[in-house]
């Protein structure tokens, strides 16, 4: 065993005829992962259609599963994040594509969970400040050329 926690992220299965996430979750738990993130689509679906959270809930409610279960897929708003906890019982959520162009979604979710109120989207001026900060961090983290190329994708999604 290693001294740092090891987690995994997987999908429901290969395709709609092979949704085997409960078996996968048990096997991963048995080999020692500390938490499991589950994307609510199959491999063959990629990102098409809506995420299916019912199999994620079945894993969470499986009495043999003792590790934290994180749900992933279509968390695009504070309301959807809250639904993941309340309706499906997950221990946490992972947010992917919804953060591209909208990195403030985390602040919006936290505010909604704490107050029950939705924060408005950022103004264009506020979005520009976020872009500037992200560009500086990206350039610092990667390098000037690749950092700027990386940020084009995010900037195009903001407006």
Spans of model-derived segments:
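Conserved anion-binding
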Residues: 3-16, 42-43
């Amino acid at each position: 065993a290693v001294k740092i926690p090891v987690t995994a992220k997987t999908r429901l299965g290969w395709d709609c005829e092979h949704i085997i996430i409960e078996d996968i979750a048990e096997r991963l738990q048995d080999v020692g992962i500390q938490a499991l993130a589950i994307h609510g689509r199959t491999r063959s679906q990629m990102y098409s259609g809506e995420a299916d959270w019912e199999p994620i809930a079945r894993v969470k409610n499986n009495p043999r599963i003792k590790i934290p279960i994180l749900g992933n897929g279509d968390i695009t708003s504070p309301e959807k994040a809250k639904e993941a906890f309340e309706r499906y019982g997950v221990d946490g959520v992972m947010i992917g594509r919804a953060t591209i162009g909208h990195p403030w979604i985390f602040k919006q979710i936290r505010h909604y969970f704490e107050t029950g109120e939705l924060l408005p989207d950022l103004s264009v001026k506020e979005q520009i400040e976020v872009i500037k900060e992200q560009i500086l961090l990206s350039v610092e983290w990667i390098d000037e050329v690749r950092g700027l190329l990386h940020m084009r994708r995010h900037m195009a999604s903001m407006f």
